[in-house]
Amino acid sequence: RRSSAASDVYKRQGDNCLFMISSHIAHDCIIGNNVIIANNVPLGGHVTIEDSVVIGGNSAVQQFTRIGRLAMIGGMTGVLKDVIPFGLSIGNRNYLQGLNLIGLRRQKYDNQKIMGLDKAFKDIFASKNLHENLSKINGEYKDNELVGEVIKFIEKDKKRPICSPLS
């Protein structure tokens, strides 16, 4: 077990994960709990996948990409941009189709919280300037921990592109 020279992390995998045939996890990846990676999915180096993520078959995840908690990646998706928590991403150059509403309901989140997240999703992606949009909604959703998690994810790494809806 060796890691790349710039890092002291090799691979960290959570509990209760399913890696189907021919999936590949490269060096320095961090995988959360309850992750499902379908057939023929390679993860590039330094990828971070948070808890309860599902990645559909024949998708590929580019190096240094982050995929937020409870996100779902459709089959045959090329993941080049970070996917927000609870996001539903598809396409050969991934874009956000919307939110993983079924996953949120299965996790038994309150409908009011889910509806608040859906409204915040529209506000966050109202224009191409995410950080300007975030400053406009500052404090509006402070009682919704789902929205807080999405905002924290976006603000954590401002160098990486965030997957957004097609306009």
Please identify what each model-predicted range represents.
Residues 14-15, 20-21, 26-27, 32-33, ...:
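Left-handed beta-helix
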Residues 92-167:
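Terminal amphipathic alpha-helical/low-complexity segments used for targeting or macromolecular assembly
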Residues 2, 18, 36, 54, ...:
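N-terminal alpha-helical segment
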Residues 1-6, 10:
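Single conserved hydrophobic/aromatic residue that forms the stacking wall/gate
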